[in-house]
Amino acid sequence: ASDITEFQESLQDIHAPGLNIMYGDKEGNIAWWATAKLYQMPDSAQTKLIMDGSNGAYEPLRFLEFSENPSAVNPPWNYVYSANNQPDSIAGMQYPGYYLPENRAKRIVELLDGIDDWDKNAMMIMITDATSLVNVEISRNLTKLVNVKKLSEDDINLLDKLSAWDGDAHLKSVEATVFHRWIYFFLKNTFEDELGPELFQQFLTTHFHKRLIAPMAQKKESVWWDNALTEETIENKKDIVLSSFVMALESLKEELGESSSKWTWDKVHTLEHGHPIGQVDMFRSFFNVGPFPVDGTREVINNMFFTYTADGQNKVSSGPSTRRIVDFSDIENSVSILPTGQSGNPFSPY
């Protein structure tokens, strides 16, 4: 393609998988397109569930034209982005999809709206940002429900720190450590009694559980609050929130000691780049890169994903595959680096 028009025309041939395509050129054009062969389903179709395909009642009504796909071409707000989040409604409806939560998208918009004179250095800081505004909202929604009469003075101090937390998951953050341990037990105490241990662990590997943490933290009434295993007691949200907080603290005390000042994020959030040969213990230190303590967390711009587990060891399993900043005013000023840097060259000073 020689220009944005030719580039856009070529995208309509992408049917699957669905991709977010970002565009920029030296003429100053910017664009984002959601590319896939989308279709319209009957209003009665519950697309999140398995449907009866035998009677034809849930067949797609039509395939959409590519022009109906979500997109933004040279928008008036002067930037485009994607964090695999749910796009705004198109033609009065939202398109269903397997989206990630809005955490990263909200932070991207906040940062981009706050600065007009972006340069390479500012962008380098942005792409390693580890703050989640959504986690701040979740933390405040949960902390206000905790019955402090049942906590020690030290526990109350921790609760106060969480209620004032700015959502930054830096290496020395105690709040990030407590928050994620609390969320694990919050999910466990809410869903495991109905799902069972095996299905609950599968549930923790889905995008769906990421998208419901914030709504459940805000939701007052739910059938999920009651523990199905306690027939004589009907638990409410406050019971689940308090018991989860207490269990999180007990878990951290057992793992990291009684002093909460030592519960820093670098103790529980690590990254190791594995090599096939490094799976053998005796070769691990020679072939693997790491493990290292690493800042960032799930669903922030510096997206270091880990699956919640009972042992609380938040081992990063995925993250940015590359970091790249292209300066169209000076292409030679662009930078790019892989996650493992120069580690494949043992003689490199880097």
State where each predicted segment sits:
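C-terminal/peripheral segments of proteins
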Residues: 1-151, 157-160, 164-350
